[in-house]
């Protein structure tokens, strides 16, 4: 399943003083509706994009599964993991800004990667050439869990997933299958240019105070020579 681009709209609301438990409750109720509104905008934008970009030339078919575990040498799975992680990060940050409790922000906000990606996976299941991918769902789940676990046990994100992209030579000879010879199109279609990283400070991860603050390590994974999902 190709990597889904999710549009994240971050709204900023001004804070105000709260003087009673009743006002706190009312504010949280209002903020919950604001949060749902933001989530609705994100999901609507994502599905609209996919419908126009991915499904416009595809035939609608009955619900079916699709096994793409080996597709794109697992770069796509890392893409799902990374997208879910980012969505969970934004969800948690929004709920904290809306004055939800730490547990509410952690478990509801931190689950946004899985919550937002799941409807899209079901949407895939009804189009020819796509399908419901169990491995995508596993990757989505792991992305959210990775955020929640770090926030729960470290109080911060000590291992940061990151993405780098550079244009590959394959897109120019793939007859449009890997993009239309421009940066944005190739970023969407050409997995040869992707490298996913796990970046961390050994001092923060291993709690060794003698290590310098500036020391940072990163482990990356990319793939090369791919002209199609299984080629």
Which role fits each region the language model picked out?
Residues 21-231:
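Hydrophobic alpha-helical membrane segments
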